[in-house]
């Protein structure tokens, strides 16, 4: 059994077993790797010399990088990526790259190679953020940006943001990351406080997004309804929740796409408070052709 596995991997136990994986030309292995994900390629790299060589090939990793990868590299100092192989460039870009005064981050997904983005609460416009009677900035390790905006109490609740970026063609979703209640650490344990959490069960919060080419999406959510949530087994208080606003399509005809978003509850008949705003995420969810195909099938 051990002899057979050795021959399968190396093709060097040459008495009678015939060709093995080690006899496959590196160029052929590279062609197969074009259809595999980066984690799959890395897992197979240890099989033998041909697989290891193909797993480091620039031609393989060039296909895994997004078409705008040079735009991402331009956000870094040249010495970070100068003379790197395409595989190493992929590794660099799969880690978050901060920009816009470190209030935004962009990176590529390690499996799909598609571009993802996050925007901190500090990178958005928040009504009343300068007044500590309404808002406070709370440092925390629970945010990728290490700080969240905490609302104590306000009547006019509005959070807006915008970003312009060269996104590769594809279908993207936008979502807000929100937390009901204030959280702290006590004796190493996470403790949540809800004394100021109120007003989110009276009227829904309206979420919206729009793009520079005219796409729009909107939705409404009640952020807090303790009795209903408990009945359904959905516990929102004390947890980070991602509220999906909608989808938009980038066709690639424009050099860059501007995305605008907002989260509002501006009914001033009641106050609301006890809410943490962390960030907005823009994530790829598919390619344009597949999206159009599903739309056609749905209409049929």
Swiss-Prot record:
Pfam families linked to this entry: F-box-like (PF12937), PP2 (PF14299)
GO function terms (MF aspect): carbohydrate binding
The F-box domain, residue ranges: 17-63
InterPro entries per UniProt: F-box-like_dom_sf, F-box_dom, PP2-like
PANTHER family xref list: F-BOX PROTEIN PP2-A15 (PTHR31960:SF2)
Protein's UniProt name: F-box protein PP2-A15
Organism the protein comes from: Arabidopsis thaliana
């Amino acid at each position: 059994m051990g002899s057979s596995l050795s021959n399968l991997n190396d093709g060097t136990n040459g008495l009678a077993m015939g060709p093995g994986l080690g006899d496959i030309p590196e160029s052929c292995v590279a062609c197969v790797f074009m259809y595999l994900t980066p984690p799959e390629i890395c897992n197979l790299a240890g099989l033998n010399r041909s697989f290891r060589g193909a797993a480091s090939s620039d031609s393989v990793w060039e296909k895994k990088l997004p078409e705008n990868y040079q735009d991402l590299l331009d956000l870094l100092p040249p010495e970070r990526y100068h003379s790197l192989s395409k595989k190493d460039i992929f590794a660099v870009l799969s880690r978050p790259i901060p920009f816009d005064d470190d209030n935004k981050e962009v990176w590529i997904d390690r499996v799909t190679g598609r571009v993802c983005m996050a925007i901190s609460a500090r990178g958005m416009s928040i009504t009343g953020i300068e007044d500590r009677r309404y808002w406070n900035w709370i440092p925390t390790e629970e945010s990728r940006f290490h700080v969240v905006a905490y609302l104590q109490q306000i009547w006019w609740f509005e959070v807006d943001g915008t970003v312009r970026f060269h996104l590769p063609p594809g279908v993207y979703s936008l979502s807000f990351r929100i937390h009901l209640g204030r959280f702290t650490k006590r004796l190493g344990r996470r403790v949540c406080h809800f004394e100021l959490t109120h007003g989110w069960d009276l009227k829904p919060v309206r979420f919206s997004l729009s793009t520079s080419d005219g796409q729009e999406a909107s939705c409404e959510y009640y952020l807090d309804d303790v009795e209903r949530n408990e009945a359904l087994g959905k516990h929102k208080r004390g947890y980070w929740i991602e509220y999906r606003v909608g989808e938009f399509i980038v066709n690639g005809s424009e050099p860059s796409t501007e995305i605008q978003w907002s989260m509002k509850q501006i009914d001033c008949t009641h106050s609301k408070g006890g809410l943490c705003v962390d960030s907005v995420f823009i994530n790829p969810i598919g390619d344009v052709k597949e999206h159009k195909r599903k739309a056609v099938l749905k209409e049929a």
